[in-house]
């Protein structure tokens, strides 16, 4: 009788302890789910560029390449060592500046 009672008491203690402490797999899964939720919340937020209207639009990288192609119809062949990438990325370039720098014959 005493051993049955001891066995029952130890089983009850182990059961209650395991209910209070999540297993390692559960805590990892919960952590991963929280990280995924945080990432999706960050993705759904609007970027600053879309939240705040900008006064001027600057062309850098791919945007500059597309701007040159739409203005000249061909890749840029710079005149007199003009660095249009630096100029257009720091200030707003006009189509006339792009034509003068890249394709003056057009």
Swiss-Prot record:
Propeptide: 20-51
Signal peptide, first to last residue: 1-19
UniProt tissue specificity: Expressed by ASI and ASJ sensory neurons and weakly by ventral cord motor neurons.
Single Gene Ontology MF annotation: hormone activity
GO CC field: extracellular region
SUPFAM superfamilies in the record: Insulin-like
Native source species: Caenorhabditis elegans
Domain of life of the organism encoding this protein: Eukaryota
Tagged with keyword Signal: yes
Coiled coil (residue ranges): none
Entries under InterPro entries matching the protein: Insulin-like_regulatory (IPR052335), Insulin-like_sf (IPR036438), Insulin_CS (IPR022353), Nem_insulin-like_b-type (IPR003235)
Official protein name in the record: Probable insulin-like peptide beta-type 1
Family membership: Belongs to the insulin family.
A Pfam short name: Ins_beta
GO biological process: dauer larval development; negative regulation of dauer entry; regulation of synaptic assembly at neuromuscular junction
Its job: Probable insulin-like peptide which negatively regulates synapse development at the neuromuscular junctions. Probably acts as a daf-2/InsR agonist ligand to prevent dauer formation under optimal environmental conditions.
Disulfide bond annotation, renumbered to this chain: 60-89, 72-102, 76-103, 88-93
Keywords attached to this entry: Cleavage on pair of basic residues, Disulfide bond, Hormone, Secreted, Signal
Localization annotation: Secreted
């Amino acid at each position: 009788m005493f051993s049955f009672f001891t066995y029952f008491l130890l089983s009850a203690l182990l059961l209650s302890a395991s209910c209070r402490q999540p297993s390692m797999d559960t805590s990892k899964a919960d952590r991963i789910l929280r990280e995924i939720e945080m990432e999706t919340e960050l993705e759904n937020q609007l970027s600053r560029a879309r939240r705040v209207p900008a006064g001027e639009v600057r062309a850098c990288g791919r945007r500059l390449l597309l701007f040159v192609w739409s203005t000249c119809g061909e890749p840029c062949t710079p005149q007199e060592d003009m660095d249009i990438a630096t100029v257009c990325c720091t200030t707003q370039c006009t189509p006339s500046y792009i034509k003068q720098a890249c394709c003056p014959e057009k």
